[in-house]
Regions:
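Positively charged, low-complexity intrinsically disordered leader regions
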Residues: 2-44
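Short beta-strand segments enriched in small/hydrophobic residues
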Residues: 45-54
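Short beta-strand elements in bilobed, periplasmic/extracellular small-molecule ligand-binding domains
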Residues: 48, 70-84, 203-206
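Glycine-rich phosphate/diphosphate-binding loop of Rossmann-like nucleotide-binding domains
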Residues: 53-67, 151-251, 258-271, 275
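Short, well-structured alpha-helical segments in soluble
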Residues: 90-102
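Anion-binding alpha/beta catalytic cores of soluble intermediary-metabolism enzymes, centered on
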Residues: 108-173, 178
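Short glycine-rich anion-binding loops that position phosphate/pyrophosphate groups of nucleotides
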Residues: 110-116, 230-232, 255-258, 285-286
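Rossmann-fold NAD(P)-binding glycine/threonine-rich loop
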Residues: 120-131, 140-144, 245-306
Length: 307
C-alpha cells in the first residue's frame, strides 16, 4: 500500500479525478530508495537486467527509461542489446547468462521480439525467481493457484500498477464490475487474475475482438480497463454512470501513434470530460509510469526475499 502522506488529488475543471501515474510513481520511488539502501547495508546486491533485440524506437526509449529509473532509486542496471539479426541461440545465451549472474536480481526480455524468435521459448528459459515482468509460465501458474492472498511471486507489472494506482486514489474495487477490453497476457488476461483475488474482489467482464455488442458491456461497467491498442475506440456515448450511479472510472492502457506521432489512447478524449466519468488515467502519464515503477518494485521484492 502506498504512503498517502503529502499527496494531493488533482482534478480537471469538471471535477473528474485525474489518476496521475507520474506523481504516484514518484511517491513509490522514494519508498524504493529507502528499501534499496537497507538491502545494500545488509550486503545484498540489487540489479535489474534488460535484454533488447533490435532497434525498435519505442523499445529503445522504453528500455532507456527503465535504466534511468534504476539510477534514480539506486538499483544497478545491466543492459544487453542484441542486433535484429540475433539468432534464437544467441538470445537464449543472453537469458542463461543473466540467470547465472549473481549481480542480476531480476531481469526482463523487452517485448515484442523479432518474428524469427520463438518468444514462448525465450520467456520460459528465464529463471522464475528472476522474472521481473512476472510473465514466466510458473509465476502465472502461481497466480492462478492462489486466489486468496499473496502468491509470493512477481506479479505482471501493468496489472499490478493499475490496481496500485486505483487503490492510491481510494477507488474501491470490492464488488465492482470491471470491463477489461483485450485478452493479451501482459495486461488483459493477467489483470483478470489480480482483480478477482479475494483481497481485490472485483467481478471481471473480459472482452475481446470476438465480443458481441462491446458497447453494451462497457455501459454496464463501474471501471473500464482498455488495452486494445485501438485509438479512440471508446466513445462518450458508450459510457454508463456505474452501478451505484457514482460515476465510471476509465483506465487507458492502449497506445497508438497517429501520423503526427502523438500518442492516442483507447478512449476518445471527449470521454475525459463526460459528466458520467468519476476518474480517469491520462494517456500518456497514467498507466505507463506505473508499469515502469512496478518493475523496480518487483526487483526490490526479489532482493528482500534474500534477507
Amino acid at each position: 500500500m502506498l504512503d498517502n502522506n503529502n499527496f494531493s488529488v488533482s482534478s480537471n475543471e469538471n471535477q473528474q479525478i485525474i489518476l496521475d501515474g507520474k506523481a504516484t510513481a514518484a511517491n513509490i520511488k522514494e519508498n524504493l530508495k529507502a528499501r534499496v539502501a537497507r538491502l545494500r547495508d545488509a550486503g545484498i546486491p540489487v540489479g535489474l537486467g534488460t535484454i533488447l533485440v533490435g532497434e525498435d524506437p519505442g523499445s529503445l526509449k522504453y528500455v532507456a527509461g527503465k535504466h534511468k529509473d534504476c539510477t534514480e532509486v539506486g538499483i544497478d542496471s545491466i543492459r544487453i542489446d542484441l542486433p535484429e539479426s540475433a539468432s534464437q541461440e544467441e538470445v537464449l545465451d543472453a537469458v542463461l547468462g543473466l540467470n547465472e549472474n549473481p549481480d542480476c536480481t531480476g531481469y526482463i526480455v523487452q517485448l515484442p521480439l523479432p518474428k524469427h524468435i520463438n518468444q514462448t521459448e525465450v520467456i520460459s528459459a528465464i529463471d522464475p525467481g528472476k522474472d521481473a515482468d512476472g510473465l514466466h509460465p510458473v509465476n502465472l501458474g502461481e497466480l492462478v493457484l492462489h486466489p486468496h492472498g499473496d502468491p509470493g511471486v512477481p506479479e505482471p507489472c501493468t496489472p499490478k500498477g493499475i490496481i496500485t494506482l486505483l487503490r492510491r486514489y481510494g477507488i474501491d474495487l470490492d464488488g465492482k464490475n470491471v470491463c477489461v477490453i483485450g485478452r493479451g497476457v501482459t495486461v488483459g488476461r493477467t489483470i483478470g487474475l489480480l482483480l478477482t483475488r479475494s483481497d481485490v474482489n472485483a467481478t471481471v467482464d473480459l472482452c475481446h475482438t470476438g465480443t458481441v455488442d462491446l458497447k453494451d458491456h462497457v455501459r454496464r461497467a463501474d471501471v473500464i480497463v482498455s488495452c486494445a491498442g485501438s485509438a479512440g475506440l471508446i466513445k462518450p456515448d458508450w459510457l454508463g454512470d456505474g452501478a451505484d450511479h457514482n460515476g465510471v472510472v476509465l483506465v487507458d492502457v492502449g497506445v497508438s501513434r497517429e501520423v503526427d506521432a502523438e500518442i492516442r489512447g483507447d478512449f476518445d478524449r471527449d470521454c475525459w470530460t463526460d459528466p458520467r466519468v468519476r476518474a480517469y488515467t491520462p494517456n500518456p502519464g497514467g498507466v505507463g509510469p506505473m508499469t515502469r515503477v512496478m518493475l523496480l518494485e518487483n526487483v526490490v521484492d526479489m532482493a528482500e526475499r534474500r534477507l
